From Swiss-Prot:
<keyword id="KW-0460">Magnesium</keyword>
<keyword id="KW-0963">Cytoplasm</keyword>
<protein>
    <recommendedName>
        <fullName>ATP-dependent dethiobiotin synthetase BioD</fullName>
        <ecNumber>6.3.3.3</ecNumber>
    </recommendedName>
</protein>
<feature type="binding site">
    <location>
        <begin position="12"/>
        <end position="17"/>
    </location>
    <ligand>
        <name>ATP</name>
    </ligand>
</feature>
<feature type="binding site">
    <location>
        <position position="47"/>
    </location>
    <ligand>
        <name>Mg(2+)</name>
    </ligand>
</feature>
<comment type="pathway">
    <text>Cofactor biosynthesis; biotin biosynthesis; biotin from 7,8-diaminononanoate: step 1/2.</text>
</comment>
<dbReference type="GO" id="GO:0004141">
    <property type="term" value="F:dethiobiotin synthase activity"/>
</dbReference>
<dbReference type="Pfam" id="PF13500">
    <property type="entry name" value="AAA_26"/>
</dbReference>
<comment type="subunit">
    <text>Homodimer.</text>
</comment>
<feature type="binding site">
    <location>
        <begin position="200"/>
        <end position="202"/>
    </location>
    <ligand>
        <name>ATP</name>
    </ligand>
</feature>
<keyword id="KW-0479">Metal-binding</keyword>
<dbReference type="GO" id="GO:0009102">
    <property type="term" value="P:biotin biosynthetic process"/>
</dbReference>
<feature type="binding site">
    <location>
        <position position="47"/>
    </location>
    <ligand>
        <name>ATP</name>
    </ligand>
</feature>
<feature type="active site">
    <location>
        <position position="39"/>
    </location>
</feature>
<keyword id="KW-0067">ATP-binding</keyword>
<dbReference type="GO" id="GO:0000287">
    <property type="term" value="F:magnesium ion binding"/>
</dbReference>
<feature type="binding site">
    <location>
        <position position="16"/>
    </location>
    <ligand>
        <name>Mg(2+)</name>
    </ligand>
</feature>
Length: 226
């Protein structure tokens, strides 16, 4: 499957930073090949708007957000509040069609791996059932080790094809804090999952050059078809 699902341990911990960094890298170095950029499902304002702000003018990048709810809460709660249903069949069909049209698809999940998509299914269920190659974003902070262990265990429970972990610095941190909060060897030992890189703190998330540079520090051979 020519796609990568980007999920995380929680909401607001770096999925969109990784997604836009990989997209910026693709735009810079693989621009002749089409890329699909898709949000699994969106509630409230956010990712769809950022995608269009950063990449909307590039015809080689096709942006898709099949389902959107105005209420910025968990999808089943938002759907109930708005009197709507969550049509995952539509999402799957648009995802498959996007793969047919483009060389590769970056699919950004919502919330964390355990976040509900419907009243019955979580992101982990979707990743497992759709057999998506997946990367897990873990924030660099106190408690990150436990979050990584718990989420990798959840991924294994759902037989997810987890390619690795990306550590994300959402704020400026010291080398000492990085080593203390997210010791790579310990995380890899406890999870039996490779850490594919560390996204540095990016002061301007609208700077495509900085996003590209951030992506270039990662183990891209495991993330993109280079």
């Amino acid at each position: 499957m020519a796609a990568l699902l980007i999920t995380a341990t929680d909401t607001e911990v770096g999925k969109t930073v990784l997604t836009t960094s990989l997209t910026a890298y693709w735009q810079t170095y693989r621009g002749k090949k089409g890329l699909g950029l898709m949000k699994l499902l969106q509630t409230g304002v956010g990712d769809q708007e950022r995608y269009h702000q950063l990449f909307g003018a590039d015809s080689s990048i096709e942006i898709k957000v099949p389902l959107w709810f105005k209420t910025p809460v968990a999808p089943p709660v938002a759907a109930a509040a708005e009197g709507k249903t969550i049509d995952l069949k539509r999402v799957w069909q648009e995802f498959c069609a996007l793969q047919q049209r483009q060389s590769f698809v970056l699919l950004e999940a919502l919330g964390g791996l355990g976040s509900p998509v419907t009243e019955e299914l979580t992101v982990a269920d979707i990743a497992g059932q759709w057999r998506l190659e997946t990367v897990l974003v873990v924030p660099v902070k106190l408690g990150a080790i436990a979050q990584a262990v718990a989420n990798v265990a959840l991924a294994r429970q759902h037989q997810i094809k987890l390619k690795g972990i990306i550590l994300n610095c959402s704020q400026p941190i010291s080398e000492e804090q990085l080593k203390d909060w997210t010791p790579i060897n310990l995380i890899q030992s406890l999870t039996s999952t490779p850490v594919l890189g560390i996204l540095p703190y990016i002061s301007d998330l609208n700077d495509l050059e900085k996003l590209t540079q951030a992506a270039s520090t990662l183990d891209l051979e495991k993330l993109l078809p280079l």
